[in-house]
């Protein structure tokens, strides 16, 4: 499959024959001191696609995006982080995970047919453009 699927308000899984990229995959845990939880069950096939993605892109450092219960499921994956001012998110994640800092406004190739470009703002948040097969564009503004 070449394309994408979504679940929740921030998670996109992108495919190029297999799951290549997942964005902001909060799938376990109850962040914000237990005050947040899922009101839906992620279908098993979507959950497998999320977990099998090669790359994990995180838009910002809020607890629902960096929940340890979810992130630990991706310990063997590569995390992609925008070049945020001060590098707090990058520095925190690289203590435990394989992390690549993506330069702003530059294409980053994930596979033969998938590439991304992200933009960080001054407030430790970011937006991602996902290009599929050089003819489809996805703009993920996540929590905005």
Where are each of the predicted segments found?
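Extreme N-terminal starter segment of soluble prokaryotic enzymes
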Residues: 1-5
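Pre-active-site segment of Zn-dependent metallo-hydrolases
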Residues: 18-57, 68-69, 144
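Metallo-beta-lactamase
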Residues: 27-28, 82-144
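A short helix->loop->beta-strand "cap" motif at the edges of active sites that frequently abuts
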Residues: 19, 75-79
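Metal-dependent catalytic neighborhoods of phosphoester/phosphodiester hydrolases
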Residues: 67-76
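Catalytic phosphate/metal-binding cores of nucleic-acid and nucleotide-processing enzymes, i.e., regions
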Residues: 62
């Amino acid at each position: 499959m070449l394309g994408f699927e979504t679940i929740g308000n921030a998670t996109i899984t992108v495919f190029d024959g297999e799951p290549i990229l997942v964005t902001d995959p909060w799938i376990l845990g109850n962040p914000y001191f237990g005050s947040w939880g899922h009101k839906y069950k992620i279908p098993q096939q979507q959950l497998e696609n999320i977990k099998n993605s090669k790359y994990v892109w995180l838009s910002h450092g809020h607890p629902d995006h960096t929940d340890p219960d979810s992130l630990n499921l991706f310990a063997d994956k590569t995390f992609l982080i925008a070049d945020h001012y001060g590098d707090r998110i990058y520095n925190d994640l690289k203590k435990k995970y394989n992390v690549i800092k993506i330069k702003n406004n530059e294409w980053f190739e994930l596979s033969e047919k998938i590439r991304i470009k992200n933009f960080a703002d001054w407030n430790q948040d970011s937006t991602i453009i996902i290009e599929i097969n050089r003819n489809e564009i996805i703009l993920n503004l996540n929590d905005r």
